[in-house]
Curated annotation (Swiss-Prot):
It comes from Azoarcus sp. (strain BH72). The keyword RNA-binding does not apply. It is found in: Cytoplasm. GO terms for biological process: DNA recombination; DNA repair; SOS response. This is Protein RecA.
Length: 344
C-alpha cells in the first residue's frame, strides 16, 4: 500500500475508534480477534462430535427444532446442566409455561441457581432475553419456545382475528437487537422451535418452523431432532432412540448426524454412547451379544454393558477419552476411582 493510502486508512481507523470506541475495528492479525470459539457440551458425546467443535459455540444463536416429544427440551436442559458444571449461569425463559422442575433436576440442572421467567407476551420474553444478554452476567439463555412467543396484539385481540406476519416481524426485530449483544457478551442463546406443515406443498418437504425466516438466517447452528424408535426393558418402554441432524453450522462443516438414546427420567445415556462409539472405532470389542474392553468382558447386551460402565465411571471415562483422542477432541480429566470386576 502506498503512503497516501496508508495515511488515509490510518486517519479513517482513528476516526472510527474515536467515534465508536476502541475495538470497533481491528486487523485480524492484531491478536485481539478471538480465533478459538469457546464451546459448551450438549451432554451427548456423539452430538458434540457432529457439531465439529466439541459442543455448541458461545456468543452465537442456536435453534433446536423437531416434532412433539422428540427431546428438544431434554437436550436443552442437558446443555444448561453442562454450563452450570463449568461454573456458568443459566436462564430459562419458559414461554410455554411447561417446565418440569423435577425432571430438570434429574438431568443434573442446579434448580437453585437457575434463573427462570414465565413471560405473558412474546415482546416481554424477548425483552427479558435481551436484558439478560446485555448484562453480560448470564452464560446461556434458553427460550422455550418460539411458537409460544405470542405477540401482545394477538393476546389483547379477539379469537379469530387475522394478524398475518406479526410473530415473524417480532422475531426479526428481536434478533436484529440481540445478535450484536450476544457476540459482545459471549452468551449462548438457544431457541427451541416447533414444526408446522405448509399447506398445499406437492413436492419437497412440507415441514417448516414457526416464527418466520429471521431465526433461520441469524442462527449459527440449527439442529433437527427426531425420535427414531423406542427402548424397551421387557414390555416397558424406558426411553427413545434419537437422531439429531445438524442442518446448519457456520462454525464447522454441516449435515452431520448423531444417534443416541434418551432414557426417561435420566436424559441422554452417556454410557450408551460410549459403548456405541467405542465399537465404531474398534476400542470396544463386540462379539455376539457380549461387549469387551482390553480383553475383559463388560456385559452381555447393551443394557448390561451400560449398567457396568455406570457402576465404573473411571473405566467409562477411560474409554471415552480414547474415543476423544481418535476423533481429535480434548480429553477429560480422569478420576482416581478403580473399576470393579465385571460379572460374567
Amino acid at each position: 500500500m502506498d503512503d497516501n493510502k496508508a495515511k488515509a486508512l490510518a486517519a479513517a481507523l482513528s476516526q472510527i475508534e474515536k467515534q465508536f470506541g476502541k475495538g470497533s475495528i481491528m486487523r485480524m492479525g492484531d491478536g485481539n480477534v478471538e480465533k478459538d470459539i469457546q464451546t459448551v457440551s450438549t451432554g451427548s458425546l456423539g452430538l458434540d462430535i457432529a457439531l465439529g467443535l466439541g459442543g455448541l459455540p458461545r456468543g452465537r444463536v442456536v435453534e433446536i427444532y423437531g416434532p412433539e416429544s422428540s427431546g428438544k427440551t431434554t437436550l436443552t436442559l442437558q446443555v444448561v446442566a453442562e454450563m452450570q458444571k463449568l461454573g456458568g449461569t443459566a436462564a430459562f425463559i419458559d414461554a410455554e409455561h411447561a417446565l418440569d422442575v423435577g425432571y430438570a433436576e434429574k438431568l443434573g440442572v442446579n434448580i437453585t441457581d437457575l434463573l427462570i421467567s414465565q413471560p405473558d407476551t412474546g415482546e416481554q420474553a424477548l425483552e427479558i432475553a435481551d436484558m439478560l444478554v446485555r448484562s453480560g452476567g448470564v452464560d446461556v439463555v434458553v427460550i422455550d419456545s418460539v411458537a409460544a412467543l405470542t405477540p401482545k396484539a394477538e393476546i389483547e385481540g379477539e379469537m379469530g382475528d387475522q394478524l398475518p406476519g406479526l410473530q415473524a416481524r417480532l422475531m426479526s426485530q428481536a434478533l436484529r437487537k440481540l445478535t450484536a449483544n450476544i457476540k459482545r457478551t459471549n452468551t449462548l442463546v438457544i431457541f427451541i422451535n416447533q414444526i408446522r406443515m405448509k399447506i398445499g406443498v406437492m413436492f419437497g418437504n412440507p415441514e417448516t418452523t414457526t416464527g418466520g425466516n429471521a431465526l433461520k438466517f441469524y442462527a449459527s447452528v440449527r439442529m433437527d431432532i427426531r425420535r427414531t424408535g423406542t427402548i424397551k426393558r421387557g414390555d416397558e418402554v424406558v426411553g427413545s432412540e434419537t437422531k439429531v441432524k445438524v442442518v446448519k453450522n457456520k462454525v464447522s462443516p454441516p449435515f452431520k448426524e448423531a444417534h443416541f438414546d434418551i432414557l426417561y427420567g435420566e436424559g441422554v445415556s452417556r454410557e450408551g454412547e460410549i459403548i456405541d462409539l467405542g465399537v465404531d472405532h474398534k476400542i470396544v470389542d463386540k462379539s455376539g451379544a457380549w461387549y469387551a474392553y482390553n480383553g475383559d468382558k463388560i456385559g452381555q447386551g447393551k443394557d448390561n454393558a451400560r449398567e457396568f460402565l455406570r457402576a465404573n465411571p473411571a473405566l467409562a471415562r477411560e474409554i471415552e477419552n480414547k474415543v476423544r483422542v481418535v476423533l481429535g477432541l480434548k480429553e477429560l480429566p480422569v478420576d482416581g476411582a478403580q473399576p470393579a470386576a465385571a460379572e460374567a
